[in-house]
Amino acid sequence: MVASGDYLDVTTPQIEAGTGASSFIVTGTAPVTRASDMVTVPIKNNLYNLPFTVLCEVHKNWYKTPNVAPRVFDTGGHQTGAGIVMGFGSSGGYDGFPYCDIGGSDRRINENAGLEKMLIGMRVKSERSTCVVSNGKLSSETKTKWEYIRSTATIRIGGQTTAGLRHLFGHVRNFRLWHKELTDAQLGEVVE
């Protein structure tokens, strides 16, 4: 017999492929909804100034952008003009193209919009040339006005807010940040 206040713990395996993709989140006894899969990391001791390169593997679980601009990562708590964004956008016939935006330099790779899995990244050289990379394909470079980011800022991986704004709806793994500009050859990794 079940008495008032009794509860049953139920767990399910995590399934990352197929039509029933799921994740298991451990919660207490209070009923909850699925949390936004977002990680926040302090900038302090992780990033400050130029040059730098970011690379990570991304699997997006959609073929049409689910919101204005799903984020792989961006920054919060930074000074004016110091924001960094890497994610997916849509424009015209290209939906889900990889892009980066830092200090007024918006770079994109339209032809990789249809990829579900990819290695995505951005490189900012010491002389301020910026590009985005997706599965070994580099965008053209443009100069950024970005110089540094204050140490109280944060890196947000997988979305923009815990409320789900610009949520990725996908998986990010092997997130890497170098305090140097990688070569074109080093940016040539491909995820299939």
Predicted regions located by residue number:
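Extracellular glycan-interaction patches encoded by glycine-rich segments
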Residues: M1-G5, R150-L177
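Extended recognition patches within non-cytosolic domains
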Residues: I15-Y48, T65-P66, R173-E192
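Short surface loop/edge beta-strand patches of beta-sandwich-type extracellular domains
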Residues: A35-F52, G77, D106-N112
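Short Gly/Ser/Thr-biased coil->beta-strand turn/linker motifs
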Residues: I43-K44, P70-R71, G96-C100, I155
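A carbohydrate-recognition surface predominantly in extracellular/luminal proteins
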Residues: N45-N61, G83-V85, E116-I120, V172-L177
